[in-house]
């Protein structure tokens, strides 16, 4: 799912799939993820952004996880590792985030910025690390999205308030 990127994301994705969908950007990351989930067709959904990378060791660990994952697991959390060159969250270098989802569960993304899912399912915390290689400082964008949501009266989850405090 592309939200209007200008960094060749769609062209790169086309090397791996013909299932590329456009989503009009409405300042809401959770809406974009919910749209992406609606397009999924496999048993599990791996949720990733264009600036996230799996190195060889973690790619191998993810492939191995597929063979040992118990059927009652609904979500696998992976360590989100921020590259510190543009990172404003210096005190949160590595944290667990939900990244792999069982498709048959009705997960809903919440919060327009620092989006997450309601975690009522059975969750497995893996050792897999997703490297976040952001290309710039996203603080202005994040705060702008937060204030637009606030002005609309959208409830901001405690998790998001914590993320914003780290910025």
What are these regions (language model features)?
Residues 31-37, 48, 54-167:
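Catalytic-site signature of metal-activated, phosphate-bearing donor transferases
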Residues 20, 24-31, 37:
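A short, glycine-/small-residue-rich helix N-cap motif at loop->alpha-helix starts
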Residues 2-11, 25, 49:
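A conserved acidic beta->alpha catalytic loop
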Residues 2, 22-24, 79-81:
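Residue-level recognition of beta-strand->loop/alpha-helix junctions
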Residues 7-16, 57:
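Acidic helix N-cap motif at the loop->helix transition within catalytic regions
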Residues 15, 19-20, 98:
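Acidic, glycine/proline-rich Ca2+-coordinating loop motifs
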Residues 1-2, 146:
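Hydrophobic targeting segments
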Residues 15, 34-44:
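Active-site nucleotide-sugar/metal-binding loop of Leloir-type enzymes
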